[in-house]
């Protein structure tokens, strides 16, 4: 199975073009003001002009209300919602109902977490996928850290691997976890929110190599 890839935290049109040219399946836009990768609605609208059909646009939100997300959707054509905060399964269901979008939940893999149970809770709530990310006591994603990949389960729901991925380790990551998709942000950056074209290309080459083996 071909492993999908999302380049997240894009803020510049040239980075969209680099990701698309390299073969990314999805582009992630961050709507969380504390993040250095946050984009305004105006920025997002401009970036969308460079994203072709068949490349999904994922909007990342952290503990946002349905009304806050809808205010973005009124202006920005997002395909999928990535809920990356402390949203409960019930809150995710309500957001999906009101926003009428597919969604997936990001789960930070804490040392004591029962990963299978947590994934199944969100699967039962209607998640179209679940993203497993490294845990950090203060940050919501983009930590640059990875978790113990041996904890990556095999379940009947698409699972996305995130956290500390780079061009150097993505082949091993895919072969170890057999993830449905991989999600990278800091691993392909020259600076926070500024992607590096060559790193994106090398990362996507690694994704293709890892999928083929």
From Swiss-Prot:
One of its GO terms (biological process) is L-tryptophan biosynthetic process. It is an enzyme of class 5 (isomerase). InterPro entries: Aldolase_TIM, PRAI_dom, RibuloseP-bd_barrel, TrpF_fam. Its EC number is 5.3.1.24. Transmembrane segments: none annotated. Pfam families: PRAI (PF00697). PANTHER family: N-(5'-PHOSPHORIBOSYL)ANTHRANILATE ISOMERASE. Belongs to the TrpF family. This is N-(5'-phosphoribosyl)anthranilate isomerase. It comes from Acinetobacter calcoaceticus.
């Amino acid at each position: 199975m071909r492993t999908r890839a999302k380049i997240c935290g894009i803020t510049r049109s040239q980075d969209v073009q680099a990701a698309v040219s390299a073969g990314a399946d999805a582009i992630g836009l961050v709507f969380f003001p504390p993040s250095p990768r946050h984009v305004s609605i105006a920025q997002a609208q401009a970036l969308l002009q460079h994203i072709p059909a068949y490349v999904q646009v994922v909007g990342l939100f952290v503990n946002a209300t349905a009304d806050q997300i809808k205010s973005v959707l009124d202006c920005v054509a997002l395909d999928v919602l990535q809920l990356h905060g402390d949203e409960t399964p019930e809150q995710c269901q309500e957001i999906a109902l009101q926003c009428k979008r597919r969604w997936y939940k990001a789960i930070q893999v804490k040392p004591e977490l029962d990963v299978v149970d947590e994934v199944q809770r969100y699967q039962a709530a209607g998640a179209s996928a679940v993203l497993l990310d490294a845990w950090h006591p203060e940050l919501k994603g983009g930590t640059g850290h990875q978790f113990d990949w041996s904890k990556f389960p095999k379940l009947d729901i698409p699972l996305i691997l995130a956290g500390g991925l780079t061009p150097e380790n993505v082949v091993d990551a895919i072969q170890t976890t057999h993830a449905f998709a991989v999600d990278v942000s800091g691993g392909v950056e020259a600076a926070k929110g500024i992607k590096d074209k060559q790193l994106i290309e090398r990362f996507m080459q690694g994704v293709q190599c890892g999928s083929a083996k």
